Amino acid sequence: MEVWYGAEQVPASLSAPGGPGAVVTMGIFDGVHRGHQAVLGRVVELSHELAHGDRRPLAVAVTFDPHPRSVHQPEADLPLIASLTDRLASLGDLGLDAVLVITYTLDFAAQSPQDFVRTWLEELLGARAVVVGDDVRFGWRNSGDAATLEQIGRQDGFEVEIVSTICSDEGRRWSSTWIRQCLKDGNMRQVSRVLGRPHRLRGVVVRGLRRGRELGFPTANLEAA
């Protein structure tokens, strides 16, 4: 999977006449949980469905860093489930061709929904189709939603597919908020359930109090990265 940090790293051939174009989704994808995986999996499927011979649109996810809430509400001190490095690693496990990482700033956030879609998805990525969850919000003050995207798609000639909310057996929506609460509560079994895989923790091994030698098996102290 390729990672493009900013528009300048996106190959011009992607959206050029005769280029493959892309099937695109967009989101923070903090944790890359089961709900995210449903949308991302459909992106990969649709990219193959739209292939003609050996010409296939790339399956591309657009994500943002830093987290928008940390830009708009820096005092909130939002705990992230995963670093950008771990987020990209999880995205790379899903069969995507590329991820575009956009630096999120207040200037970027000031774009209208129409400007965002046309500048970044259509002109830059050559979007042939856009796949999103039914709770998608984008553009100035989150004024764009699924209906907005469908309207732009009809006007500009690209396909839009809305993936319905995916819920647990008890009817709760898989979400990053749920994972953060489980992490706060120390409920790692539930964290793994919502993620659909074990939770990753990255850090540097540091010297501890050497109590592990008293337990009869090796231990490691991690300083969270």
Question: What positions do the PLM features span?
Answer:
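Positively charged, low-complexity intrinsically disordered leader regions
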Residues: 1-22
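General small-molecule cofactor/ligand-binding pocket signal
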Residues: 2-4, 99-102, 159-163
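A short acidic, often aromatic-flanked loop/helix-cap motif at beta-alpha or helix-coil junctions
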Residues: 9-13, 106-110, 167-172
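Active-site rim/loop-helix segments in enzyme catalytic domains that contact anionic ligands
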Residues: 17-26, 34-98
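Catalytic acidic motif of RecA-like/P-loop NTPases
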Residues: 30
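Hydrophobic pocket-lining residues within nucleotide cofactor-binding pockets
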Residues: 64, 104, 165-166
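N-terminal Rossmann-like or analogous alpha/beta NTP/dinucleotide-binding catalytic cores
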Residues: 68-156
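Active-site cores that bind ATP or allylic diphosphates and position pyrophosphate for catalysis
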Residues: 118, 122-225
